[in-house]
């Protein structure tokens, strides 16, 4: 799917994924920098912080935490110690079947990441009939839209994926049984809407609004388009 294609930005033809974190504030830009190192050390897997341009240019107060890095046992790392056991790190094995077994171990690790590292934020979803799904700047805009629509008696809420991989498919599927429709907002032509449709499995209609070329959706246009779907 589209967002999962983004996770393979480093190129290559192997069966792998990157952990992808999508910040929605300056605070999260700071926090995710530390988190990404912890996750990459824990799983020996690359992590991408996928921020849009608006977040990158934003000025906000943030709290610098006293967070101490988690120590992770890394038996694969070189220590430089005298008389240590030799440790050769390779990604390609010529022996028949060896590379496939290595790839099976990687797939097992990716399944563990999918089970343990899904991150998302739920906003006013307790009684929502329409669910926005958005990340980054688009998610911030949707919160303002939700407050305005609720003032008009239209019950809306937001599911914000924080991890674009692993994607919060299961929670989207569960919430799809409780709502009437989904409205995806992005600052592109629709890179996540495909994942949302796959997650909800045709339980409810999925609508989309996006702006391209650095354009930012406005509250007015989101509300206008959403009302056309009701």
How would you name each of these model-derived features?
Residues 1-2, 31-34, 58-65, 144, ...:
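Short acidic, glycine/serine/threonine-rich loops at helix termini
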Residues 186-230:
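Peripheral docking tails and interdomain loops at the edges
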Residues 44-122:
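Conformationally flexible catalytic loops at phosphate/diphosphate-handling active centers
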Residues 119-155, 159, 165-171:
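Redox- and metal-dependent alpha/beta enzyme cores, enriched for Fe-S-associated oxidoreductases
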Residues 34-39, 64-67, 144-155, 173-177, ...:
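Short, solvent-exposed amphipathic alpha-helical segments in soluble enzyme
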Residues 51-57, 136-138, 189, 213:
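Glycine-rich beta-alpha junction loops
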């Amino acid at each position: 799917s589209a967002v999962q294609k983004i996770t393979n930005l480093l190129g290559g033809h192997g069966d792998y994924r990157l952990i992808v974190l999508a910040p929605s504030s300056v605070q999260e830009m700071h926090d995710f920098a530390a988190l990404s190192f912890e996750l990459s050390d824990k799983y020996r897997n690359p992590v991408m912080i996928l921020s849009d341009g608006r977040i990158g240019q934003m000025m906000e107060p943030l709290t610098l935490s006293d967070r101490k890095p988690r120590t992770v046992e890394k038996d694969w790392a070189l220590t430089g110690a005298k008389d240590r056991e030799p440790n050769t790190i390779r990604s390609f094995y010529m022996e028949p079947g060896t590379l496939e077994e290595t790839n099976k171990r990687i797939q097992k690790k990716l399944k563990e990441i999918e089970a343990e590292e899904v991150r998302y934020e739920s906003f006013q979803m307790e009684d929502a009939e329409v669910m926005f799904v958005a990340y980054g700047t688009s998610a911030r805009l949707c919160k303002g839209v939700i407050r305005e629509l609720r003032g008009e008696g239209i019950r809306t809420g937001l599911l914000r994926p924080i991890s674009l991989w692993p994607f919060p498919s299961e929670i989207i599927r569960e919430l799809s049984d409780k709502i009437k429709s989904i409205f995806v907002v992005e600052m592109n032509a629709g890179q996540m809407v495909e994942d949302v449709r796959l997650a909800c499995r045709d339980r409810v209609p999925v609508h989309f609004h996006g702006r391209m070329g650095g354009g930012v959706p406005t509250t007015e246009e989101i509300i206008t388009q959403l009302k056309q779907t009701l």
